Structure formats: C-alpha cells, structure tokens
Amino acid sequence: MVVPPVTRTARPAEVRAGDPGILSTHIHSDGGHWELLYQPGVGNRNPAVQKTLDERLVYISMQGNEIFKLAVRAMEEVALEALAANNLSTSDIDLFIPHQANRRIIDAIGKRLGLDEEQLFINLERYGNTSSASIPIALDEANRGGRITAGDILLLDAFGGGLTWGAALIRW
C-alpha cells in the first residue's frame, strides 16, 4: 500500500470572545460504581432472548438513593469545573440544561450551584427521562421556545450509567 505524504499542516482554530461555539467540554467516568446503574442483559454475552427476558436481565438495575447522591455531587463538580476552566461563575450562566432524569436531582443541583428558576430549563414533566436524548431535546425546545438568544452562555450537564458524567459550556 502506498500512502501519500502529508501535504497539509494543521492550523490552530481561534475562537474570539463573543463568538458562538463550544467553550469547553469535561467528561469523567468511574467504573468502580458500575453496579449502581447498569443493564445486565445487553450485548453479545446476554442478548435479548427468552431466557434473559424471563430472568429480567434486559431491564435497568439501579440503586436509586446512591445514584441520587453521586449524580448530584458529580454534576455539581463537573459544572463548576467547566465554569472555572472558562473563568466564569454561575451568575454568568444564561441557561442551565441538565440531563432530565429526575426532578429531585435537577432541583438539588440548581440549589447547590445557586441558580435561580430563570436559569434552569426543565422539560421532564412533558417527556420523562428520555435517556441520552434528554439534553438535545431540551436544547431544541429551549431554542424553539425563545429561551436562548445569540450570545447566551449555556451549561449542559449530564450523568449516566457506567458511571459517567460530563458538562459542556456553550456560547450560543
């Protein structure tokens, strides 16, 4: 196989203050707590066949109280990490869009971050927990509903199985 030499060089991208775009992303995981939230009957080892259905292995297993505590702590920490990386504070957030898993988690994070109701976007009551689609759905709804305007600072914050959590700071 003949591979042509690299003929182009990489160039740095510059995002000027005020330009729309992703300011930063922050992602973490801790497999040491995987048993708190997982789905045992997935993949090649436990495919969805009658046996795994009968043994209820296709359903999510969650230790709710422990997940609540970990989710609130992790989502708060990663939100503060994103803000610190950009020399911002919670008062700079125009809209906080968290993973729409549980109203108690959202309220607890909002309180710990000192956010007011106008800074929170919650659509959980309309759609329920839509899993990994919750933030994109909420972002689209907030945009279409006029809750986001050009130049706004958005903080997206999520937590999920495995355990994983992350935040993205965006200038709209």
Please report, for each region that a protein language model flagged, where it lies by residue.
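Condensing-enzyme catalytic core mediating Claisen C-C bond formation in acyl metabolism
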Residues: 1-69, 73, 77, 159, ...
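Claisen-condensing/thiolase-fold acyl-transfer catalytic domains that form or cleave C-C bonds
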Residues: 72, 76-79, 83, 94-172
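Short, surface-exposed connector motifs at secondary-structure boundaries
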Residues: 87-92
